[in-house]
């Protein structure tokens, strides 16, 4: 049901030179703050958590239908193969294509939504926020968060750093940056 050849190429970064990158970090590629896919995946997760897999599935399939138009990649990768066919509830049943480890169907669905948020949110704040949120309450469906050249068991980054301009000009900002490892109130 899924062919991610084009997305993989779009996300591949040539670290030896900046000028040859024509995908996610191409110099004119938009860096979105809020997106259609993010909103649909929020709706998918919340509908499933507050109801059932069947309640969330249409929202996930909306994202897949949009991706099947090539909306998630730029024109440099439209000629590469991609396919995002709609899921059905059986795909999340024990032994289904999205549940090879036999967890309950709803958890398998939520895990797929979180994985899609992780991949689609590449370069955005979504994976970072999901990592903090799910580590506390739903580690069984969280995407493993690996720090390159960093500790694998903590401390984990808890917040984004404050910009110096924010600290200097915003009267609501703390007197000094507390650092990325200081837990926010919601994560204590």
Question: What residue ranges belong to the model's regions?
Answer:
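Acidic/polar-rich alpha-helix caps and helix-coil junctions
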Residues: 1-188
């Amino acid at each position: 049901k899924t062919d991610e050849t084009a997305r993989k190429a779009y996300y591949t970064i040539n670290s030896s030179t900046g000028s040859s990158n024509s995908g996610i970090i191409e110099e004119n590629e938009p860096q979105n703050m809020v997106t259609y896919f993010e909103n649909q995946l929020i709706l998918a997760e919340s509908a499933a958590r507050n109801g059932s897999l069947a309640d969330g599935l249409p929202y996930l399939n909306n994202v897949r239908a949009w991706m099947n138009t090539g909306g998630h990649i730029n024109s440099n990768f439209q000629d590469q193969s991609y396919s995002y066919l709609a899921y059905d509830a059986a795909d999340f049943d024990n032994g289904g294509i999205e549940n090879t480890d036999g967890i309950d169907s709803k958890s398998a669905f939520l895990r797929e939504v979180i994985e899609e948020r992780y991949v689609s949110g590449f370069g955005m704040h979504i994976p970072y926020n999901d990592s903090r949120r799910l580590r506390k309450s739903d580690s069984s469906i969280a995407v493993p968060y690996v720090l390159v050249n960093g500790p694998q068991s903590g401390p984990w980054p808890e917040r984004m750093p404050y910009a110096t301009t924010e600290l200097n000009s915003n009267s609501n900002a703390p007197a000094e940056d507390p650092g990325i490892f200081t837990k926010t109130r919601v994560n204590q």
